[in-house]
Amino acid sequence: MAITAAASRLGTEPF
């Protein structure tokens, strides 16, 4: 998912 890709960059899950 796109969320996983974004989280990979930030190093945290933006939930």
Swiss-Prot record:
One of its GO terms (cellular component) is phycobilisome. GO terms for biological process: photosynthesis. Keywords: Antenna complex, Membrane, Photosynthesis, Phycobilisome, Thylakoid. It is found in: Cellular thylakoid membrane. The keyword Zinc-finger does not apply. It is a peripheral membrane protein. It comes from the Bacteria. Belongs to the phycobilisome linker protein family. Rod linker protein, associated with phycocyanin. Linker polypeptides determine the state of aggregation and the location of the disk-shaped phycobiliprotein units within the phycobilisome and modulate their spectroscopic properties in order to mediate a directed and optimal energy transfer. This is Phycobilisome 32.1 kDa linker polypeptide, phycocyanin-associated, rod. It comes from Anabaena sp. (strain L31).
